[in-house]
């Protein structure tokens, strides 16, 4: 049995909460972020939410989370796994720290599917995918420096100078 499920983050722009699910409107979100003087924030899914997702009929369950450097999702997924394992100690669940975001997570999911379709054991899939993650590098390009300035990762002066010189971080 295949059990694919996306567990969304909750994004906050000002006082508004936006769920990052299939209804997410990226253009609308970007407009709201640009219009808001505060930096957007996010909340990771709860351990209970992960636990519910793990409660499926699949023999092998793999969770791929945002980088633990960017989000608490990895820790929540681990806690959710521990909770479900209390009642289902025979479940095979592995949580992958993607060390990435966006397309990096998708590529990891595709690698898991490729390994499963090749008939690898649970342990072989985990080992192969962990090795794959170690070799993966994801780069981001920012359109502007506003969010870095808003969240304090870049001073107002540095953001102003970099924007005036049309410098973007890489």
Residue ranges and their predicted role:
Residues 1-16, 69-73, 77-82, 91-94, ...:
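Mixed-charge interfacial surface used for oligomerization/domain docking
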Residues 1-49:
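N-terminal glycine-rich anion-binding loop in soluble enzyme alpha/beta folds
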Residues 29-32, 58-60, 89-92, 136-139:
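A short alpha-helix capping/helix-coil boundary motif
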Residues 41, 63, 95:
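Short catalytic-loop micro-motif centered on adjacent basic/acidic residues
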Residues 45-61, 65-81, 85-87:
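Active-site cofactor/cluster-binding pocket
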């Amino acid at each position: 049995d295949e059990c694919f499920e996306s567990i969304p983050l909750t994004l906050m722009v000002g006082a508004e909460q936006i769920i990052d699910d299939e209804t997410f409107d990226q253009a609308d979100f970007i407009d709201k972020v640009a219009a808001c003087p505060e930096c957007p924030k996010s909340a990771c899914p709860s351990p209970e939410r992960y636990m519910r997702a793990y409660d499926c009929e699949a023999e092998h369950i793999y969770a791929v989370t945002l980088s633990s450097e960017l989000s608490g999702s990895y820790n929540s997924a681990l806690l959710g796994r521990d909770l479900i394992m209390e009642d289902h100690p025979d479940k095979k669940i592995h949580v992958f720290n993607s060390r990435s975001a966006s397309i990096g997570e998708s590529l990891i999911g595709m690698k898991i599917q490729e390994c499963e379709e090749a008939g690898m054991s649970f342990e072989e899939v985990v080992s192969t995918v962990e090795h794959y993650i170690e070799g993966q590098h994801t780069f981001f390009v920012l359109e502007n420096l506003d969010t870095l300035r808003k969240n304090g990762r870049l001073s107002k002066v540095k953001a102003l100078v970099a924007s005036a010189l049309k410098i973007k971080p890489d």
